[in-house]
């Protein structure tokens, strides 16, 4: 670790723990997609806090826009900022073959942010919405483990099943991109999925306040 650069990405707990491990071992920490603007340090908690902490301790920060640079300047980061032309998400698309078969009745759902899954009222509103539109669309909800656990603890899984909403385990990246691509629209709270849908031209309903 001491002689190499270690790259981290995102705003999850694993991002934070990995960053602490690198710094503890005196490694050089590189943060990809650094400086995404946040509405407030304690909004989108804990994601915004994680973004801030990791940015502050990174040696190098990779950005692809002026808004990210401005955010990092507001945070007064000490690491060097390197601007690239496009988001690193483009690299993920290399080698992904898109299936041209579209299902105009399918809606793909991916919800995982803490602000949504830890709030029973918000999660119940989402479940009600999905059950309502399931009369018109085939709903496939790909569940992260924390999301599934919260739905179970709130006794909402049965409501989804009774409402003909399919709850599925996560799948491989290229398979998931094709699920997005073949959907009529996507419901998500993930910034990465929003960008992916923009790249492949799929309408997206962003399920978060800001």
Residue ranges and their predicted role:
Residues 58-65, 139-141, 186-187:
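A short beta-strand/loop micro-motif in the catalytic core of glycosyltransferases
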Residues 10, 65-67, 86, 144-145, ...:
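Helix N-cap/beta->alpha junction signal
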Residues 7-9, 31-32, 61, 176-210:
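A donor-sugar binding/catalytic signature common to diverse glycosyltransferases
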Residues 101-182:
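Donor-nucleotide binding loops and adjacent catalytic segments primarily
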Residues 1-76:
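Active-site and donor-binding regions of nucleotide-sugar-utilizing enzymes
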Residues 25-26, 133-137, 200:
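Helix C-cap/helix->beta junction micro-motif
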Residues 34-38, 87-89, 169-173, 209-210:
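Short, acidic/turn-prone active-site loops that include or flank metal/cofactor-
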Residues 55-119:
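A nucleotide-sugar donor-handling region in carbohydrate enzymes
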């Amino acid at each position: 670790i001491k002689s190499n650069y270690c790259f981290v990405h995102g705003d999850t707990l694993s991002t934070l723990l990995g960053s602490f491990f690198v710094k503890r071992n005196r490694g050089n920490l590189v943060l990809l997609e650094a400086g995404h603007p946040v509405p407030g340090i304690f909004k989108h908690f804990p994601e915004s806090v994680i973004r801030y902490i990791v940015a502050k301790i990174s040696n190098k920060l990779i950005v692809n826009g002026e808004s990210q640079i401005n955010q990092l300047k507001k945070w007064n980061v000490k690491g060097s900022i390197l601007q690239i032309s496009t988001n690193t998400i483009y690299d993920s698309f290399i080698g992904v073959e898109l299936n041209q078969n579209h299902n105009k009745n399918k809606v793909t759902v991916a919800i995982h942010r803490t602000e949504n899954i830890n709030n029973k009222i918000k999660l119940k509103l989402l479940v009600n919405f999905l059950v309502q539109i399931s009369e018109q669309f085939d709903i496939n909800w790909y569940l992260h483990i924390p999301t599934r656990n919260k739905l179970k603890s709130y006794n909402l899984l049965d409501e989804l099943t009774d409402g003909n909403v399919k709850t599925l385990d996560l799948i491989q990246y290229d398979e998931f991109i094709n699920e997005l691509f073949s959907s009529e629209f996507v419901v998500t709270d993930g910034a990465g999925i929003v960008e992916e849908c923009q790249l492949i031209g799929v309408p997206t309903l962003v399920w978060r306040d800001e």
